[in-house]
Amino acid sequence: MKHDLKHIVCIGGGTGVFAVLHALKDRAHVSAIISMADDGGSAGILRKQKIVPPNDLRKAMVALSANPELAMEFEKRDDAGFALGTHVIVGIQQKKGLEEAIREVSLELKVTGEVIPVTLDLVELSAELQDGTIIHGETKIDILNS
């Protein structure tokens, strides 16, 4: 790390965060603290299998990658809608754990900065509405805002 670079911490897990990470990767040392509440699409399928979905972690690592060719491969999707990178991370995760999967994939992608999950456990985002109703799941909460 160059000493003249600023250290910036980004917290989140949506499309905007990944665009910010990509824009900052050559201008600062970036630590990305990534939400683990994604439950849509392939992440929802992984959750049903009791696997912590690494989708947003993958996107953050790709955004911070200094290996653009491999990063592009990681984003290619199979017929079920899973990104190749998700398959790779889950494969390592099931054998060695999520932390080791992040470490190994970060090395292969030549990630500049750090990608840190907010938790290593399966979690569910919930929201309490003004009327006291509790909504569970990121996708259900997102629907309320559209």
Features from the language model and the residues they span:
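Gly/lys/ser-thr-rich phosphate-binding loops in alpha/beta enzymes
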Residues: 1-51
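Electropositive, gly/pro-rich neighborhoods at or near active sites that engage anionic ligands
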Residues: 35-145
